[in-house]
Amino acid sequence: MGSCVGKERSDEEDKIDFKGGNVHVISNKENWDHKIAEANKDGKIVIANFSAAWCGPCRVIAPVYAEMSQTYPQFMFLTIDVDELMDFSSSWDIRATPTFFFLKNGEQVDKLVGANKPELEKKVAALADSA
């Protein structure tokens, strides 16, 4: 378990890899709005992962998040790089990465700060059971 709080990003750092999953990378506000509208139309719960390429815990939890996106196709898994979308991320009051928001019909129903795999799995499973 862990989280990162602020660090300057170097240009050499790679993006976080969500290989093998069904994670949608959000690159701008319009893309976010489109995905939220799509999820609402389809009745899907959105799990939004605010992370950063330089954040070690974000990199550790990424394969878990990707795997969950395969296990729970009834949800929409999104990821937002806080450095690429600084203003948008600030509007969500991100204080540490990773931060996960759970949204139903566009409204926040839960939140998790940090790369706490057991807690993330518990929250996602609970949402799956209640859906």
Curated annotation (Swiss-Prot):
One of its GO terms (cellular component) is cytoplasm. This is Thioredoxin H4-1. Belongs to the thioredoxin family. Plant H-type subfamily. It holds the Pfam family Thioredoxin. CDD domains: TRX_family. The active site is at residues 55, 58. It comes from Oryza sativa subsp. japonica. The keyword DNA-binding does not apply. SUPFAM superfamilies: Thioredoxin-like (SSF52833). InterPro entries: Thioredoxin-like_sf (IPR036249), Thioredoxin_CS (IPR017937), Thioredoxin_domain (IPR013766), Thioredoxin_H-type-like (IPR050620). Disulfide bonds join 55-58. Keywords: Cytoplasm, Disulfide bond, Electron transport, Redox-active center, Transport. It is found in: Cytoplasm. It comes from the Eukaryota. Its main location: cytoplasm. Probable thiol-disulfide oxidoreductase that may be involved in the redox regulation of a number of cytosolic enzymes. The keyword Metal-binding does not apply. The record marks 56-57 as: Contributes to redox potential value. Residues 3-129 form the Thioredoxin domain.
